[in-house]
């Protein structure tokens, strides 16, 4: 569940946030994710924000579904991609398709700890055989609210190990760290998990 104050922040700053992140360099990270996908596959952009990655995946020939918990972000993303974007949170999303890949870029970090681990138990069921989940999280931060009222959940090796322990049908295929592309003093963890059976 994404809390109300976090959603309210993105509703109030949707245009500004989307513009700030629209052209952030993500080519390398997206390329790693895409190499695990069937080119005819379907992607779920879970917490799609302003639709930056959703649009690029579409331009690369993929069919993409997107959702976000912020109604204003959904409006911006739909305008940017030309596609409908469903307004819902991680808990209430109901898939109509099976996915080759699930992309959760900088979105799960707004979950509670319980919601974060519940995501993997639930969303792996939306994957087809050998489907993958990509997610990115901030490392080296404490769980809590920032000065803008947004909730953040930090990430560490212990949390990754718990995901794998609770989900033996998910295999870690890649785990790497990257610098912040907005030039903040942050390090991001990037993880790709693959459904084994």
Each language-model region and where it sits:
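Conserved class I S-adenosyl-L-methionine
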Residues: 1-38, 40-49
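Conserved beta-strand signature within the Rossmann-like core of class I S-adenosyl-L-methionine
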Residues: 130-137
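Class I SAM-dependent methyltransferase SAM/SAH-binding core
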Residues: 50-92
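Acceptor-substrate binding/catalytic loop of class I
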Residues: 143-159, 182-184
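A short acidic, Gly/Pro-enriched loop at the edge of an enzyme's catalytic core
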Residues: 94-102
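A short glycine-rich, Lys/Arg-flanked "PGG" loop and its adjoining helix->strand segment in the class I
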Residues: 117-129
